[in-house]
A protein has these predicted regions:
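FAD-site-proximal beta/loop scaffold in flavoenzymes
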Residues: 4-82, 171, 175-177
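Poly-acidic low-complexity segments
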Residues: 14-19, 85-91, 126
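Solvent-exposed alpha-helices and their adjacent loops that cap or buttress functional pockets
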Residues: 40-41, 45, 89-90, 136-138
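Rossmann-like dinucleotide-binding cores of NAD(P)H-dependent redox enzymes
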Residues: 56-64, 71-112
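Flexible, glycine-rich terminal cap/loop adjacent to redox cofactors
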Residues: 93, 98-222
Length: 222
């Protein structure tokens, strides 16, 4: 039995409580502040970042939004066009569900790709074939990568998204985010030498599955 159950269902924006309107900043009916990809509000010299600009409400997203806003402001002040051109790319925000096992993902999902009519090639590596996962006694889970498989990619499509289910998935999702940021393809990731035995090498294995060169996947059960 329990004496108390705490249900946390999200955050409520306080845009209507900070007198933003007195500075001319527009606030939505729900209390959010709309910004562009440089984190500017409707008032060009005022920026906003974090939960108040909308989903996803994540600390690491807010930090990078702050970096963008600071770079743009500094670039304009110093006359540095490279800094002034900084922009926030929302497609490379990793998300983690801190459950047991953990679930982590970044970039495009299969459902999103299907909805957008994007043809993808999937590489899925089961942790049941991971030496480290087996040694840990936690081989439930998998690593999945999605690559552009459109005709224009000519078989060398860049990575569009990826996800992991398993222990410490959140600690490893950053590598997939970096691969998306750098425009890596399956060969790039598969040829990256990962230490063995580690959970992280499942990322390289998943890329090899997509490429058709993985030799570590167990045969399908009959």
């Amino acid at each position: 039995t329990y004496d108390l159950v705490l249900q946390a269902v999200g955050r409520t924006p306080n845009g209507k409580k900070i007198a933003a309107d007195k500075a001319g900043v527009a606030v939505t009916d729900r209390g959010f502040i709309n910004v562009d990809i440089q984190m500017r509000t409707n008032v060009p010299h005022i920026f906003a970042i974090g939960d108040i600009v909308g989903q996803p409400m994540l600390a690491h997203k807010a930090v990078h939004e702050a970096h963008v806003a600071a770079e743009v402001a500094a670039g304009e002040l110093l006359g540095n066009p490279e800094l002034a051109a900084a922009a926030f790319n929302a497609r490379v925000i990793p998300s983690v569900a801190y459950t047991d096992p953990e679930v982590a993902w970044v970039g495009l999902t299969e459902d999103q790709a299907k909805a957008q009519g994007i043809k993808v090639k999937k590489g899925l590596f089961p942790w049941a074939a991971s030496g480290r996962a087996i040694a840990n006694g936690r081989d439930e889970g998998f690593t999945k990568l999605l690559f552009d498989d459109s005709p224009e990619a000519h078989g060398h499509g860049k990575i569009l998204g990826g996800g992991m289910v398993g222990t410490h998935a959140g600690d490893m999702i950053g590598e997939i985010a970096l691969a998306i940021e750098m425009g890596a393809d399956a060969v790039d990731i598969g040829k990256t030498i990962h230490p063995h035995p580690t959970l992280g090498e499942s990322i390289g294995m998943a890329a090899e599955v997509a490429h058709g060169s993985c030799t570590d996947v167990p045969p399908a059960r009959r």
